[in-house]
Amino acid sequence: MSAIRFFHMADLHLDSPFKGLFGLPEHNFKKIRTSTFEAFNTIIDKAIQEKPDFLLIVGDIYDGENRSLPAQRRFQEAMEKLFQHNIPVILSYGNHDHLNGSWTRFALPSNVYELPAETSVVQLNIRGQQVNIYGFSYSERHVKESKIESYPIASDQHVLHIGMLHGSEFSDTTHAVYAPFTKEQLLERNYHYWALGHIHKRQLLHQNPPIVYPGNIQSRHRKEQGIKGFYDVTLSQASVELDFILTSAVVYNTVEVDCKNMFHANELLKKCEEALSLNRQAYGASVVELHLKNIDEHASSLFEHATVDAWLETIREAEDGIEPMCWVQKLVLHTSSTLYEHTAATKSVVNLMEQWDITAWKDILKDLYQHAGGARFIDPLTEQDIKALMNNAQELLAEEIQRT
């Protein structure tokens, strides 16, 4: 049998509102606001050009359960384009766009298979190769129970079996648990490929057979850093090939500038401009956190008479009008540890923290560790955690002192 080819994507979050962005020029905000649509258009254009056998969209097509009209219209138009090119689409809805939401419905063309709330199978015949695709859509926002047992165990290995699942591993404590599973449970189904969604970070949980999170197609805030995209998958009974395709219209990223031995403001500005220019060349349009590292005794003088906010505004003005956009969302100062002792306030706080034992730290953090909703996601406090907390506290205190 010949190999099949499909695109695996998830978490489109079309029409995401992009909250928390302040002070952007209007043209920059519009670029960011429409970035999910631009990323999605990249996928559709690629599909029309490359003509894969089908597309898999694993949950959270829309950002909200109300499925905004602009998002639905653009998605429906994209499906019509794929229909004209005879490209099937198998999709599921996730926790953000579950079936129990309220929205004005658009009819999708016949090439689109919408998975229902109960685990179902879509069967395709591609050049003589039978393909079974299993999955479900969320009936409501919070699907906390495991759905794995509803997926049939594959027995006919002449058929290519693909599982679609919008959910998270039982062991993943960094995200709210939805439709939880273990890797072992997925492997027990004997499928040739697991197309996952829900986690916005690209991950390969297992090599053979592949258990794959493609991540989302466009970052929505500064915690979702790096390039985003989807997987172009070539699959046969004997082999699989995964090719990651970039779709990010705007990349969220961290840029670092070494400030050691700097004396003059123009020197720092030039270094920042050079670093942002390199980022622009590498990633195109971007939103960055600019980290000023190694601020020693010489460089600290640059912040004695100018606040961090003043520096941020000056750097933004220098970048304004340069295309593609590179918006500095946040400026972070990393003061050399040798400078902490130069302020009595910093020194007194550090001395106080050094006197606390692990019991004292637990008492200080008790509100966090006793929180009804969040406590189960937090690992037990360790000595390494305490050291990290102290270092972060010192940097934050030094930064706040320099802001005043």
Where are these regions (language model features)?
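Well-ordered alpha-helical segments embedded in enzymatic catalytic cores
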Residues: A39-I43, R74, K271
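Glycine-rich phosphate-binding loop signature in dinucleotide/nucleotide-binding domains
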Residues: Q49-K51, S155-Q157, A282-Y283
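Hydrophobic pocket-lining residues that define ligand/cofactor binding sites across diverse proteins
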Residues: A47, L82, N279
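His/Asp/Glu-rich metal-coordinating catalytic cores
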Residues: F54, E65-T234
